[in-house]
Amino acid sequence: MGLTGKETILIHSSMKAIGEVEDGADTVLDAWMEYFADGLLLLPTHTWANVNAECPVYDPRSTPSCVGLLTNLFRRRNGVVRSLHPTHSLAGFGKGAAEYLAGEDENNTPCTPGGAYDRLKDCGGKILLVGVGHERNTYIHSVEEVLNVPNRLAAEPMELVTILPDGTEKKVYMRKHYNAMQPHISEDFVKLNQAFLDCGAVEEVVFGDAECLLCDAKKVFRVVRHVLAPDPECLVTKTEIPAERWRNFE
């Protein structure tokens, strides 16, 4: 894959796609944590499926992740730090994990500009999609927030509660992803597949049995900005994005 192990890397994954591994998911996590020990390994530990207006409490020590087996095992490992974002937390291991994830309890949207997702583009960050596609690439939500794409967030916030490390409760007002035309906005991110490949922002690689996409965060940001510039809502409103849209990308 051309990775040195010193990168800041966010991995979205499907254990099922990786295939049979001796000792299963723990072996996969061991490999990632060992390889990226001199970098910063990030996994999503989202809770949007089980933290909401009806069930508003997020405790980073105990609230389960809703995005897969590997993420739930990872968040409980020694040395792993979990952010305080009540719906779109990340867990990190390695160099500067606590510092990188600090302040996420101040966010009021899933991927607030200046937050942990956005800063991937500023630190040479990578995103590795293991056995999943861009429909699971939360970073694109972040890009849309930075670009202020309309009709991506609910008008009214939810009132949530984050349990801080000292046990105190912090009230957080969080707007969730929402679009009246498309209840699952990220499903349309796959319309950018060819643009990313053609523009050199994404490389097709393999991990185990899983087909993977290795993304450069800064390049992904630039491609999305370029493609959306003439029609910011096109990912939802158009059935496909014509290649002419990125043919002159530099």
Predicted regions and their residues:
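Glycine-rich phosphate/diphosphate-binding loops that line cofactor/substrate pockets in enzymes
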Residues: 1-8, 120-123
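Histidine-centered active-site/metal-ligand motif
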Residues: 12, 141-142
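Short, solvent-exposed amphipathic alpha-helical segments in soluble enzyme
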Residues: 26-28, 143-148
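Short, flexible loop segments at boundaries between secondary-structure elements
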Residues: 37-38, 150-184
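Internal, conserved structured core segments that host functional sites
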Residues: 52-141
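Acidic/aromatic/glycine-rich contiguous surface patches that form carbohydrate-binding/processing clefts
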Residues: 175-250
